[in-house]
Amino acid sequence: MRAKAWRHFLTITHHRLVVMRHCFAVGLYRQGLTHDLSKYSWTEFRVGAKYYSGTHSPNVEEREELGYSAAWLHHKGRNKHHFEYWVDYRPGTRVYVALEMPPRYLAEMCMDRIAACKIYHGKDYTDKDPYEYLMHAKDTSSMNARTRAQLTFLLDLLAREGEKAMFAYIREHVLTGEDILSREGIEPDTTKEPPFSQA
């Protein structure tokens, strides 16, 4: 258990440092410094120590064993770079909806996904990996349609033109508040937005 705990500590710290470096590259200094600090809390860290594999998130193992992941529920409610954080109900209807992520957290989500692929793929990592992971992911059904379209565009840009081009685009267009979907002529697919129950 101690060996797993130490390896988990090294993995999450390495991940944080990669995200920090990427966030700093686009000017997100505070977010770079505070990224994923909740992973060091006992609620999240103990799960990592117990289920650590080094090839994927320990939350997957906890979910398979318990039917849910307490660590993930704790994490997503405290970290705004996860699209799952951005769910609330509409005033009047009280129907839960997926909200569009603010630009700074969309950018941090991109950095988080890049770093995760770099950590888990190691020397085999390519700039296509985050885009391919998104395309094959089954856990994005509750993402806001505009957020999904923006994320897809940015990770596709990474796959086609590389990190330098993507980071420059984030600095010049995303973090300035520009509507990148209008800029690029992208129409979000609202048919993928999920129905939520009433509050």
For each of these PLM feature ranges, what is it?
Residues 1-199:
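Metal-dependent phosphohydrolase cores
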